[in-house]
Amino acid sequence: MTRQTITILLIFFSFSCNAQQIKIGTWTTRDGGAYTGEIVSGKAHGKGTCKYPNGNTYEGEYVKGKRQGNGTYQFADGERYEGQWFQDQQHGQGTYYFMNNNKYVGLWFRDYQEGHGIMYYYNGDVYDGNWLQDMREGEGKYTFSNGAYYKGSWKSDKKNGKGEFNWGDGSSYVGDWVDNMKHGKGLYKFSDGDSYDGEWKNDLQDGKGV
């Protein structure tokens, strides 16, 4: 018997053993969820559906009793997550549908919106940029439904650092921001062609400027 033949037989035997271990059955999670689907060694492993006492449901992949892989989690209040899971947490690429009709499409880290993602707001606004623990953080662009936009730095869900705000009517501001206010040095161009280049404090012109 050749080495290649032996290798093929070993692979076939391994798959056969794994197939024998997988059963279709029921299982109860630690938090009282009723699972129905593929089971290995007495735990959810593979594809299945779980219904929880609070009305939430999950349909997707499991690894050793935990949500892992791809799956959809439907909340009783109408919110829904579709995407990747790791160790029972929303982790990787996923889409979240909020009860208020907002929709987030992007990266997740341990149940948080983290990394690059796009939030489509119910009123037509869109944010495309970086996130940290469910908040806008780092570089990103927020476009309002009327065409106005802010492009620049964010911290703790607010405009902070260097950024540009364009109102779409010919007026714009490029400069420093602190907690959503023009603060520091910046250039404001008015729609009539005038401009102010100088210091700002709490959203108002302050100190020297031209």
What residue spans do the PLM features occupy?
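Sec-dependent N-terminal signal peptides
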Residues: 4-15
